[in-house]
Amino acid sequence: GVGFKAGVKEYKLTYYTPDYETLDTDILAAFRVTPQPGVPPEEAGAAVAAESSTGTWTTVWTDGLTNLDRYKGRCYHIEPVAGEENQYIAYVAYPLDLFEEGSVTNLFTSIVGNVFGFKALRALRLEDLRIPPAYSKTFQGPPHGIQVERDKLNKYGRPLLGCTIKPKLGLSAKNYGRAVYECLRGGLDFTKDDENVNSQPFMRWRDRFLFCVEAIYKAQSETGEIKGHYLNATAGTCEEMIKRAAFARELGAPIIMHDYLTGGFTANTSLAHYCRNHGLLLHIHRAMHAVIDRQKNHGMHFRVLAKALRLSGGDHIHSGTVVGKLEGERDITLGFVDLLRDDFIEKDRARGIYFTQFWVSIPGVLPVASGGIHVWHMPALTEIFGDDSVLQFGGGTLGHPWGNAPGAVANRVALEACVQARNEGRDLAREGNEIIRKAGKWSPELAAACEVWKEIKFEFAAVDTL
């Protein structure tokens, strides 16, 4: 019996280890596995562990030259998904040495790179990842984080207000800058480039940057508050992105923006490093996320993309509005909002959190609520998200019948009224409409906004932005 035993053998003989004790340094993954008919769940779970770590479809001679026990991924636990037929959660532990330090790109290439096309599976979804401190400490993380951002902006004790400039495509740079100025002058903290505003024929990036920064300075001098506009630096090459970021810095802009999924994690991490080194805040848009996270049984849950972003680096990230229709959605969204903001998050399956996550010293990221929200949602948003958030009203600002600046005034008055009411101990869930209506008596701008969008029912069941 010299040599090795060639041939195909079942994955579960090597990669299914139900008695494995996970190490503090292991990266842990929770996969939702839907096996093909006739494939036992243990084999499916082991196949995922194998194909996303050291395994291939057959035994190879060079297996003898490595220490499989040190390097293999292990499926250490499998449980059926309640209420779903033929779906299982497979827990996989990966040894730390399988991954390059400081590279989200390499982490994803390994864990979700190849295995999703695997024939033995009908579908596969990565639900959660546990990033151990030994790995997270190899990342810079967000350029600045929540506390440093508040200090830079000198804004405390309330959510920040933003607005995406619409129509998103077609405005000239000067008219675009005018819209920015009006919103900031009216009382918003930030305005935002839309995710697909890069550098198109109708508005080149350099012209936009100049007019927007002029708008920022004008609004700052008139209001005495620090203002910002998310200048979208996303471009076709990393070099071009850094060039745009450098120009923003030269102009004295406080914050730039990146589409991290279309731009890619490598580009995002480079940009985040540049931003920390040069004092720029970094706003992250999640364009393309639904391609990856919308299917319930295949792809990746957004909480994984959110964790990856906290490692790669960003100071703000879009995270849905939560004033959606489904109760469960709210808990799940708040689960990954906490994963973005807090240092330590306990395992809590009701909120979709499969693992206890300890971020050590990596700064927090501000969640951004945007999409179909307006002044009547303000009490719900204030209560749900708390102070550490950015509330973005695009149409809810620019759709005001009197124009952009009054739209901004309406939002700011509504927010300040909600924060004051909360600080006085009032119940925003029950008294929300009343608080907004009363504030409208002192602010004609808010009264006009209330009239346009009418009040909504306040079981927090408002707008469904899927």
UniProtKB/Swiss-Prot annotation:
Entry comment on modification after translation: The disulfide bond which can form in the large chain dimeric partners within the hexadecamer appears to be associated with oxidative stress and protein turnover.
Taxonomy, superkingdom: Eukaryota
Catalytic activity as recorded in UniProt: 2 (2R)-3-phosphoglycerate + 2 H(+) = D-ribulose 1,5-bisphosphate + CO2 + H2O; D-ribulose 1,5-bisphosphate + O2 = 2-phosphoglycolate + (2R)-3-phosphoglycerate + 2 H(+)
Keyword Metal-binding recorded: yes
Binding site for substrate: N114, T164, K168, R286, H318, S370
Signal peptide annotation: none
Cofactor binding summary note: Binds 1 Mg(2+) ion per subunit.
Residues with site note (Transition state stabilizer): K325
Active site: K166, H285
Function: RuBisCO catalyzes two reactions: the carboxylation of D-ribulose 1,5-bisphosphate, the primary event in carbon dioxide fixation, as well as the oxidative fragmentation of the pentose substrate in the photorespiration process. Both reactions occur simultaneously and in competition at the same active site.
Note: The basic functional RuBisCO is composed of a large chain homodimer in a 'head-to-tail' conformation. In form I RuBisCO this homodimer is arranged in a barrel-like tetramer with the small subunits forming a tetrameric 'cap' on each end of the 'barrel'.
The protein's name in its UniProt record: Ribulose bisphosphate carboxylase large chain
Organism (species): Dionaea muscipula (Venus flytrap)
